[in-house]
Design a protein with these regions (language model features):
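Class I S-adenosyl-L-methionine-dependent methyltransferase catalytic core
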Residues: 1-206
Length: 206
């Protein structure tokens, strides 16, 4: 295979969040596959967010820590506590518009659970206030399908940043897979601005 983006090995197909190679038994409870911090660093080189951001599927805090290091005031939440100090236990899909209105205006940056990624995206867009920026780290194949087409017609992403192969790790254990190990799954940052109705721009993030 001649693919300049491929830097992995035979283990790589088992690394990433939601890869089709995972069996149900292999998946962590609540679909926990942590995102390589580099993915957030690359996003922040391209996009600016409001000073207050919400990582609403924070897991062990791999994204939250990078955001905080970059000067953002981060609200970190998840459906269960995975050890990040200060994590708020929140079922994101049960958050209402009223909850948002009664809170600080925050942009959203997260890698949602694979099995309910579409629900996460739709819910974030439905409850957010106008001009809220929402960035979701998703499989590139999120672009496919009739249901997604309807979503994109209603809420077109402003930008999709396609990534060369980045690493995600089961249970947040990046050391298990070795430095430089890639993944068989292509990912992208999908960035929405609530209220945007123009065409989607596709860019390459690295």
């Amino acid at each position: 295979m001649n693919n300049k983006d491929w830097t992995g090995n035979a283990k790589s197909i088992f690394v990433c969040n939601g890869a089709s190679n995972h069996t149900e038994e292999e998946r962590q409870e609540n679909d926990y596959y942590a995102t390589e911090p580099k993915a957030v660093e690359l996003l922040l080189q391209k996009e600016k967010f409001s000073s207050h951001v919400w990582e609403c599927a924070c897991g062990g805090g791999h994204m939250s820590k990078v955001l905080a290091e970059q000067g953002y005031i981060v609200k970190s939440s998840d459906i269960i506590d995975r050890g990040l100090a200060g994590t708020a236990i929140i079922d994101f899909l049960k958050v209402t518009k009223e909850d948002i209105l009664n809170d600080i205006q925050r942009d959203i940056i997260t890698n949602p659970p694979y099995k309910i990624a579409r629900e996460f995206v739709e819910h974030a867009l439905e409850i957010s206030m106008k001009n809220t920026k929402i960035a979701m780290f998703l499989k590139l194949t999120f672009l496919e399908g009739k249901a997604r087409k309807k979503l994109f017609e209603k809420y077109p992403p402003k930008v999709v940043y396609v990534s060369s192969r980045l690493q995600c790790a089961k249970n947040g254990d990046f050391e298990k897979y070795g430095k430089g190990v890639g993944t068989a799954v292509a990912y992208a940052w999908f960035v929405w601005r609530k209220g945007y109705k123009g065409d989607t721009v596709v860019k390459w993030i690295n």
